Amino acid sequence: MSTSIPDVAVHDSPAIAAPLRWVGMDGIVVPVQLTTADGGQHVIGRARAQIDLPAMGVKGIHMSRLYRLLDTYAVEPLTPVGICGLLSAMVNSHADCASTAARVDWYFDWLRRVPALVSNDLSGWRGYPVWLRAEYSAGHVQFWLCVEVAYSSTCPCSAALARQMLADAFLQEHVEVSALSPETVADWLRSNGSYATPHSQRSLARIEVALTEQAVELGLPALVDCAERILSTPVQAAVRRVDEQAFARLNGANLMYVEDATRRLQHGLAIHYSAFRVHVRHLESLHPNDAVASTADE
């Protein structure tokens, strides 16, 4: 009985000889260690690991090699500095395939404790979907960090229409009244202020920023803080009525079309980041479709 185990990827030739741009695995379950100024965090994520296959006569790559390298790296914090070593090891592990490029994508949710708007003793958890891509090619490494921020948007046109209807209703009801006390007006508004309300919706901003090879952390807190400060209406976690009231005030003070939100982010991010892309989606409550805008191609 033969004790040798066949290795088809090594000993067989492909039926069609052709180079492949990327080959690897997707959907790999991995632990992710994050280091931020807020402290460390361990989360579960998924990864995609790939290399190029320029050798036309090689039938297949050695995916187990990539898996073991990714598994070994998983015990380290996820940083650009550390990822550079992983990418280099991936390329070196496939010298027999003439590989010169490698890339890894990580997908996970970053959890953060956020305080209520007004209640000092109240806070709750928020989850931010994160995507990190690292690609090595031609001796250079590129990093893109993407985070999705959820916020509320209220339609400026709808707000104007609601104000007009409220004003018309007030005038119609008081057409024969020449003078009203402030208290009377306030009482009327408390009873009739919702005569017409503007439509609003949960909205999503996907923000991608370039990172440098020398970065010692991803900078997630700074990026999220910057985006939420620009938008002014991030969705909340735990709230009381006083916090919900403050949120309503923020929405009224920050009426936004999808174009407004995208331009706000474009202007504000340019102060802090040299290279970035913004994709915004408003999950319309008036229409069955979404409104979208972006600063770059998808």
Swiss-Prot record:
Pathway assigned in UniProt: Cofactor biosynthesis; 7,8-dihydroneopterin triphosphate biosynthesis; 7,8-dihydroneopterin triphosphate from GTP: step 1/1
Taxonomic source organism: Xylella fastidiosa (strain Temecula1 / ATCC 700964)
Descriptive protein name: GTP cyclohydrolase FolE2
InterPro entries (UniProt xref): GTP_cyclohydrolase_FolE2, GTP_cyclohydrolase_FolE2/MptA
Gene: folE2
Family the entry assigns: Belongs to the GTP cyclohydrolase IV family.
Pfam families: GCHY-1 (PF02649)
Keyword list, A-Z: Hydrolase
HAMAP family found in the cross-reference section: GTP_cyclohydrol_B
One term of GO molecular function: GTP cyclohydrolase I activity
Reaction equation(s) it catalyzes: GTP + H2O = 7,8-dihydroneopterin 3'-triphosphate + formate + H(+)
